[in-house]
């Protein structure tokens, strides 16, 4: 059913095991050769894949529509470049080289545990040891070519020109939905280097990626009712690991594609407000409000970060662009009472406990105060269109009052 509706643009980049090995190798180089903190890479090969695009070494899905020999030549060249880089530039040891394949296998087994349990995938499908050569710093290139060529050819009927498809649908009056899998603060230019991805992660990129003219779009800002990060980020609002809410949230917070444990923290209105101020969005969605319901000894107090403060007492109402400064800051919190009621069945805003409604209002008000600072607020404010109270599509509250009315509850 999915394949009948799927179109992969012919210019889509092909990322493979070479990129993933390079990702791990550069992380090893950063730590062992440069004596720096790890970047916290997912190990998915994203940055090396984009480096190939910038360097004009890319392999695209269009290559699956050509001959096998041409594809094999390009992938062989990529593999040889990767091996030389890993061995001679990154100076990876033989022991570490071998560990990469085990590490990638373990990561995929963890990320695909549910699919394997359901029989959708087999364990051998995610076994990266099959790509390791017999000698150190060699690859089973024939096997790599076979696996990736067969995978690409299986999608050959789904490869097409997405930009024409989008333009056709737009001319027919249909709505096009584009989704960014990462946040504004992971944008390669606007985020916190080196803890960023290799692409642009907010609205302007939709035109570049889709290949369509710049035009008016309606952007939704999407956030959780608390904060999470994964990797080695400086996390100003990170919760103490022993806090009852942190313990609870860590049971549900794992990377979608990697299965990695996420760090959890209090809602950071400074980051959200600056994402609105500099990134821009017309409406807001907040999910996982239900995860904040308290029980047990904890009294349910919730914190919202409304400013940062340095050691001299100076307050910051925006995220500093200087990472040295940002790393030195502490959060300034405003506390709000929590609630113990189960809100997963609420479908109307009025169904929520008073404390939950006030907390929601405070999240919206605090980010608006950051975004618009001392300027005159615009007439049309971003409204909270959807409020998630559970993982199911039906567990969404859609009647939240308009922003001007909502923030009066804070």
Task: Identify the meaning behind each predicted range.
Residues 1-410:
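Non-transmembrane, aqueous-exposed alpha-helical and coiled segments at domain scale
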